[in-house]
């Protein structure tokens, strides 16, 4: 992962291409049952919409888009640096038993 393309940066940081956001918007448009697991008209997709996807950083009261992009870029750079170190030093297999 020495280099990554502009497309990869865009996919990582562009909110309009964020799959979770698009999926959440799609689920919001559906007429679903109750998200309460104890309700007789419980719907798993409603639960997913109300409980899981609302925890997405761009859907709640979390980081701004600018801060989110900054954090995503920092995470990419950190990952890239770790890959460079592993590629230059090789992988450490000392924890694996040789007889296996």
UniProtKB/Swiss-Prot annotation:
<keyword id="KW-0808">Transferase</keyword>
<dbReference type="GO" id="GO:0003968">
    <property type="term" value="F:RNA-directed RNA polymerase activity"/>
</dbReference>
<dbReference type="InterPro" id="IPR005093">
    <property type="entry name" value="RNArep_beta"/>
</dbReference>
<protein>
    <recommendedName>
        <fullName>RNA-directed RNA polymerase beta chain</fullName>
        <ecNumber>2.7.7.48</ecNumber>
    </recommendedName>
</protein>
<keyword id="KW-0548">Nucleotidyltransferase</keyword>
<comment type="function">
    <text>This enzyme is part of the viral RNA-dependent RNA polymerase complex.</text>
</comment>
<comment type="subunit">
    <text>The polymerase complex is composed of four chains, the three other proteins of the complex (alpha, gamma, and delta chains) are supplied by the host cell.</text>
</comment>
<keyword id="KW-0693">Viral RNA replication</keyword>
<dbReference type="GO" id="GO:0039694">
    <property type="term" value="P:viral RNA genome replication"/>
</dbReference>
<dbReference type="Pfam" id="PF03431">
    <property type="entry name" value="RNA_replicase_B"/>
</dbReference>
<keyword id="KW-0696">RNA-directed RNA polymerase</keyword>
């Amino acid at each position: 992962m020495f280099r990554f393309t502009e497309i990869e940066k865009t996919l990582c940081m562009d909110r309009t291409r964020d799959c979770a956001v698009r999926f959440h918007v799609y689920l919001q448009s559906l007429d679903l049952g109750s998200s309460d697991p104890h309700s007789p008209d419980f719907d798993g997709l409603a639960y997913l919409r109300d409980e899981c996807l609302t925890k997405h950083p761009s859907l709640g009261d979390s980081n701004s888009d600018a801060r989110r992009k900054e954090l995503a870029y920092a995470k990419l750079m950190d990952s890239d640096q770790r890959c460079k170190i592993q590629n230059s030093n090789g992988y450490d297999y000392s924890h694996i038993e040789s007889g296996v």
